[in-house]
Amino acid sequence: MTRYIFVTGGVVSSLGKGIASASLAAILEARGLKVTMLKLDPYINVDPGTMSPFQHGEVFVTHDGAETDLDLGHYERFIRTTMTQNNNFTTGRVYEHVLRKERRGDYLGATIQVIPHITDEIKRRIIKGAGDADVAMVEIGGTVGDIESQPFLEAIRQLRFEVGAKRAMLMHLTLVPYIATAGETKTKPTQHSVKELRSIGLQPDVLVCRSDHPIDISSRRKIAQFTNVEERAVIALEDADTIYKIPGILHSQGLDDFVVERFGLQCNGADLSEWEAVVDAKLNPEHEVTIAMVGKYMELLDAYKSLIEAMSHAGISNRTKVNLRYIDSEDIENQGTALLEGVDAILVPGGFGLRGVEGKITAVQYARENKVPYLGICLGMQVAVIEFARNVLGWKDANSTEFDSKSGHPVVGLITEWEDATGAVETRTEASDLGGTMRLGAQDCLLEQGSLVHDCYGKDVIVERHRHRYEVNNNLLPQIKEAGLKISGRSGDGALVEVVEAPDHPWFVACQFHPEFTSTPRDGHPLFSGFVKAALTQHQKKA
């Protein structure tokens, strides 16, 4: 039977519930347990697919094509379990389902209420998402006390009661601030946060106390006394210089032992040698490179969370410190390519909309003409094709129909038809809704032997995740290929361009898929590893 660990946060948001939860999950997995994780988001959007990156940050795409919260990226980077659409749901998704059932008459004329109908649906989804895992970590988004979170908190209160104390526990993250003028940490915010939880019938079993200063034994003892939490279950989690230290920090305080004993689980001790190796490689690099990341959402770097982590993973696998120089593509439009001088490689990630696109195209031209290693992802591939068409073929009006519907040379256009992972044909038009209508999830990609991308993967067929609605225009592809642009990857049915490479260039690869979604700290990712190797070669050439 599955055991549940419900995770809540108090005092302030952004305490790192996702990282802490994933770190505990990683330790339990290292003990031989099957672990899965769920994220419950209290906003009314059905999913984050149409939300602004400036508000929500990254949209993480699962293997089965769900557009989800970025915390699911943390989950997959810390544990081996592959997340699905069942691992993340929102208030909007729950209400949508309940209202659809009401319209069908499934409730037989009953008055639909938050309790029991909404809470029952939340519980049903939690149980379904947990599947047959030994332990399911269930993270509740937001902060205790928020109105939006109340249905979720009531649902976990009910579920905790229904399955019993031997199968459910509550882990609460809280802030223990350090007051510089007093020279001490303060426990009162934590006491009040737990008081708020207890007022709705939830008593924490574990407190994870976040702080930027050490929390001494006396403070932990005081917290335990005033919150009715065992002293051994009051965990001090100070800021760390890398998030991959967190599993070791939690393990050193016996959190996994407490969980295993509480649930009565029989399992091995934790083998954290893989995490120790990751931390060692991260903190003791032998080389260093600087890579320019040219994007349009630089005001909120969480918009590129998986990509930034993937570059870190590539550094780990190459024993190389990767310094990312974050450059807003609009700054290139205004200030020119001087911003790119001195870098060892250039990375252009995905994005939507016209703003900043010309700056990205200029960055591609700089990389291609100056033989600087280049990796383009999603829009980064599309702008690479546009740049090549403009400056090599001489099609000065070349563009994507996303940015200029009247372009004389629309080298990138809307995908109107494609096969999904099951072989079913999906169609789209300009009139289709924005939400949930992209080419999403894992798709086969056929690689050309002898290409740079094939050298990276060492395979003829790969599977990578997608999130896009525009593609290279096959009608103009013959001229583009004749001019020298190499098509080194195609979709499984051969219909869509997946990877392009520039001719006469040491390392220029652009892909339509999002490889960052499958990169992990322990295994890295072959494409990012190859990119960092190319940057290192470039750096050594300049030395």
Curated annotation (Swiss-Prot):
Indicate the segments forming the Glutamine amidotransferase type-1 domain, all copies.
290-541
Which residues are in coiled coils? none
Q: Which reaction does it catalyse?
A: UTP + L-glutamine + ATP + H2O = CTP + L-glutamate + ADP + phosphate + 2 H(+); L-glutamine + H2O = L-glutamate + NH4(+); UTP + NH4(+) + ATP = CTP + ADP + phosphate + 2 H(+)
Q: Where does Mg(2+) bind?
A: D71, E139
Chain positions covered by the region annotation Amidoligase domain: 1-265
Which GO molecular-function terms appear in the entry?
Answer: ATP binding; CTP synthase activity; glutaminase activity; identical protein binding; metal ion binding
What pathway is this protein said to act in by its record? Pyrimidine metabolism; CTP biosynthesis via de novo pathway; CTP from UDP: step 2/2
Q: Which GO terms describe its cellular component?
A: cytosol
Q: Which residues bind UTP?
A: S13, K186, T187, K188, P189, T190, Q191, K222
Please tell me which top-level EC class this enzyme sits in.
ligase
Q: What does the record give as the active site?
A: C378 (nucleophile), H514, E516
* Key words, A-Z: ATP-binding, Glutamine amidotransferase, Ligase, Magnesium, Metal-binding, Nucleotide-binding, Pyrimidine biosynthesis
By what means is the activity of this protein regulated?
A: Allosterically activated by GTP, when glutamine is the substrate; GTP has no effect on the reaction when ammonia is the substrate. The allosteric effector GTP functions by stabilizing the protein conformation that binds the tetrahedral intermediate(s) formed during glutamine hydrolysis. Inhibited by the product CTP, via allosteric rather than competitive inhibition.
- InterPro entries hit by this protein: Class_I_gatase-like, CTP_synthase, CTP_synthase_N, GATASE, GATase1_CTP_Synthase, P-loop_NTPase
Q: What else is known?
A: CTPSs have evolved a hybrid strategy for distinguishing between UTP and CTP. The overlapping regions of the product feedback inhibitory and substrate sites recognize a common feature in both compounds, the triphosphate moiety. To differentiate isosteric substrate and product pyrimidine rings, an additional pocket far from the expected kinase/ligase catalytic site, specifically recognizes the cytosine and ribose portions of the product inhibitor.
Give the protein's function: Catalyzes the ATP-dependent amination of UTP to CTP with either L-glutamine or ammonia as the source of nitrogen. Regulates intracellular CTP levels through interactions with the four ribonucleotide triphosphates.
- Report the sequence similarity comment from the record: Belongs to the CTP synthase family.
Question: What is the official name of this protein in its record?
Answer: CTP synthase
From which organism does this entry originate?
A: Pseudomonas fluorescens (strain SBW25)
